[in-house]
Amino acid sequence: MDLKGKTLFITGASRGIGLAIAKRAAADGANIVIAAKTAESDPRLPGTIYSAAEEVRAAGGQALPLQVDIRDEQAVLAAVAQAVMTFGGIDILVNNASAISLTDTEHTPMKRYDLMNGINARGTYLCTQACLPELKKAAAAGRNAHVLTMSPPLSMKTHWFAPHTAYTMAKYGMSMCTLGHAGEFRKYGIAVNSLWPRTAIATAALQMIPGVDVAACRKPEILADAAYLVLTSDARDAANTGNFHIDDELLAAHGQADLDRYAVTPGNRKFIPDFFVD
């Protein structure tokens, strides 16, 4: 099973992990809806919906760049309608867009709290709700419908909350969407899963966090390859929904034990661990 001719609606796909997932799918000849906010280049965060579209086309896919703020319900509904008008439907939703602030309660103003929850938890829920009618059609037509959310396994351990309670709440909100929607959408034949990296991933956003050694990170392509495995699995198989995958575990389970090619620094074995993975 591959992604040729499938349409993927990917949020936050103008750069980083979202773009890597888009390009991996494009290599099969997929249609990619690039739903992201950045339409003009910013030297601090290179990449726009238009530059991403060029990369997707160069990789072998079709691209529809759409400027979308996933906090805006009407903007999301309009983007879904445009995707359907352009490609005839939506087979896969990838909830990748996310906001982060690693601040404690005293240093997290409500504006920042609302931003994280608006993008992470609410945005994931909204995009899933908006795409659901098309995903149901795709599943009914045997097109292997999937929802994949880039969020961590749920853990109630205090050390994952205390340093950045607001961020954890927002990120776990995405994971709770996976938990609930996997059960809710099972009857439609739509698989719903989460995927999370074991290590820090070298993205432009990560490099803006002070003190991060990018040389001790892995590349976004490890998540792209792991996502591909999820999205090409049989959505109607009960074992393939409701999972909280860790990238290297999933790859190893599919026989990909040598992960050195994903290291920013080849040969490195000491990576920065990501949040929420014990």
Question: Residues of each region from the PLM?
Answer:
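Conserved glycine-rich cofactor-binding loop
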Residues: S14-R15
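C-terminal helical subdomain
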Residues: S194-L195, G211-D278
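The beta1-alpha1 cofactor-binding region of Rossmann-like NAD(H)/NADP(H)-dependent oxidoreductases
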Residues: G47, Q67-A79, M110
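Catalytic loop of short-chain dehydrogenase/reductase
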Residues: K136-K187, W196-I201, V212
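A short, exposed helix-loop element centered on a Lys and neighboring polar residues
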Residues: T128-Q129, L179
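Substrate-binding pocket helix/loop in short-chain dehydrogenase/reductase
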Residues: D104-T105, P109-D114
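Conserved glycine-rich Rossmann-like NAD(P)H-binding loop of the short-chain dehydrogenase/reductase
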Residues: D28-S51
